[in-house]
Amino acid sequence: MKPDIHPVYRTVVFHDTSANEYVKVGSTIKTKREIELDGVTYPYVTIDVSSKSHPFYTGKQKTFDSESSAARFQKRFGHFIGAKRG
């Protein structure tokens, strides 16, 4: 490998602000902020959504209407189909 062309790989703390959870992950992201966790200073990045807060991973998914698109169309516009012209 050539020297001085690869980004620095280091442990970074990602803070999920919606769940107030901290996750330490190896990353090459550049940050200006730092945080101290367990007596060690790490680069710090805030994020809005992670596996700690996303509904798919937490099991708090919303269920959507399972009615087919054809049934919805028929309900909305079915009265036009049988109407007489004239």
UniProtKB/Swiss-Prot annotation:
GO cellular component: ribonucleoprotein complex; ribosome
Keywords: Ribonucleoprotein, Ribosomal protein
GO biological process: translation
InterPro entries named among the record's database cross-references: Ribosomal_bL28/bL31-like_sf (IPR034704), Ribosomal_bL31 (IPR002150), Ribosomal_bL31_B (IPR027493), Ribosomal_bL31_sf (IPR042105)
GO molecular function, one term: structural constituent of ribosome
Pfam families: Ribosomal_L31
Gene3D superfamilies from the UniProt entry: Ribosomal protein L31
Cell cycle keyword on record: no
Statement: the UniProt record of this protein carries the keyword Ribonucleoprotein: yes
Subunit structure: Part of the 50S ribosomal subunit.
Family from the record: Belongs to the bacterial ribosomal protein bL31 family. Type B subfamily.
Protein name listed in UniProt: Large ribosomal subunit protein bL31B
